[in-house]
From Swiss-Prot:
Subunit structure: The 26S proteasome consists of a 20S proteasome core and two 19S regulatory subunits. The 20S proteasome core is composed of 28 subunits that are arranged in four stacked rings, resulting in a barrel-shaped structure. The two end rings are each formed by seven alpha subunits, and the two central rings are each formed by seven beta subunits. The catalytic chamber with the active sites is on the inside of the barrel. Component of the immunoproteasome, where it displaces the equivalent housekeeping subunit PSMB7.
Record gene name: PSMB10
SUPFAM superfamilies: N-terminal nucleophile aminohydrolases (Ntn hydrolases)
Protein name according to UniProt: Proteasome subunit beta type-10
Reactions catalysed according to its record: Cleavage of peptide bonds with very broad specificity
Inducers of expression: Up-regulated by interferon gamma (at protein level).
Length: 273
C-alpha cells in the first residue's frame, strides 16, 4: 500500500505568506496582497432580563457599497447569537462552523450549550489562524448562569463585558454606551440605547450604514428585530423633474437613412413529433 510522502497537516498553511514576503524582498516595488479595509458597527449590552445585540446592515467592498441590507447577527444556538464584523465571508463561515459544532455538542451531551463554550471554541479557532481570519465577533446569550456578553478579536483574545462595540464605527458607538449605560436596564431603555449607539456608528463612519438590526435574547428565547431603525433614509424629491415637450429647443437636426442588406435568410422547421 502506497502512502504520501508528507502527511497532511491540520491548521492554516503560511506558505503563501512566506512566499509573498520573499518576493517582496527579492523584487523591490512588487505589489503584494494586503488586507482589505472593512467597515461595520456592531454592539451589545446586558440588561436586567437578558442580552440585546445590534448591528448595521451595510456591506462594503473597498469604497463600494456591495449590500445595503446585509444580515450581521448570526444564529449559534436557540439562546445564543453572534454579531460579526470584518471580512463578511470569514465571519459568516466562522459562525456557521460554531453553530454546527454547538448543535453536535448539544446532541452528544443532552444539554443546552453555554455561552462560555461558544466563546472558547471561537477564540481557539481564531487564535489557531493567527489573525488571518478577519472576524471580530460579539457573542451574547443566556444560559443557566444568566446573561453573558463576550467580545472576541481576530487574533483570539476575548473579554467579558456588560457592554461592548466592535467594527470601524466602534469609537462612536462605545462613546454612547459609556455615557448612558446603567446596570439592570429595562428592555425598552436598553433597546433605545442600542439603537442610538449603532446610529452614532453609522453617522460617524463611512463603512457603516443602512438600517439598525437587533436581537433580544432572554431566558424565554430570542427575537430578531430586522430594520428596527433607519437613521439614513433616502432623501425625497421636492418635486417631479418632468418637463413638457419643447422646453429644450432643438438647434439643429440631421437624419441619416439606414440601409440594410439581407445577406442570408434561413428558415428552421419546427419538430412537431
Amino acid at each position: 500500500m502506497q502512502k504520501t510522502v508528507l502527511e497532511p497537516q491540520r491548521g492554516f498553511s503560511f506558505e503563501n505568506c512566506e512566499r509573498n514576503a520573499a518576493l517582496q524582498r527579492a523584487l523591490p516595488g512588487l505589489r503584494v496582497p494586503h488586507a482589505r479595509k472593512t467597515g461595520t458597527t456592531i454592539a451589545g449590552l446586558v440588561f436586567q432580563d437578558g442580552v440585546i445585540l445590534g448591528a448595521d446592515t451595510r456591506a462594503t467592498n473597498d469604497s463600494v457599497v456591495a449590500d445595503k441590507i446585509c444580515e450581521k447577527i448570526h444564529f449559534i444556538a436557540p439562546k445564543i447569537y453572534c454579531c460579526g464584523a470584518g471580512v463578511a465571508a470569514d465571519a459568516e463561515m466562522t459562525t456557521r462552523m460554531a453553530a454546527s459544532n454547538m448543535e453536535l455538542h448539544a446532541l452528544s451531551t443532552g444539554r443546552e450549550c453555554r455561552v462560555a463554550t461558544v466563546t472558547r471554541m471561537l477564540r481557539q479557532t481564531l487564535f489557531r489562524y493567527q489573525g488571518y481570519v478577519g472576524a471580530s465577533l460579539i457573542v451574547g446569550g443566556v444560559d443557566f448562569t444568566g446573561p453573558q456578553l463576550y467580545s472576541v478579536h481576530p487574533h483570539g483574545s476575548y473579554s467579558r463585558l456588560p457592554f461592548t462595540a466592535l467594527g470601524s464605527g466602534q469609537d462612536a458607538a462605545i462613546a454612547v454606551l459609556e455615557d448612558r449605560f446603567q446596570p439592570n436596564m429595562t428592555l425598552e431603555a436598553a433597546q433605545e440605547l442600542l439603537v442610538e449607539a449603532i446610529t452614532a456608528g453609522i453617522l460617524g463612519d463611512l463603512g457603516s450604514g443602512g438600517n439598525v438590526d437587533a436581537c433580544v435574547i432572554t431566558a424565554a428565547g430570542a427575537k430578531m428585530l430586522r430594520a428596527l431603525s433607519s437613521p439614513t433614509k433616502p432623501i425625497e424629491r421636492s418635486s417631479q423633474y418632468r418637463f413638457a415637450p419643447g422646453t429644450t429647443p432643438v438647434l439643429s437636426q440631421t437624419v441619416v437613412p439606414l440601409t440594410l442588406e439581407l445577406v442570408e435568410e434561413t428558415v428552421q422547421a419546427m419538430d412537431v413529433e
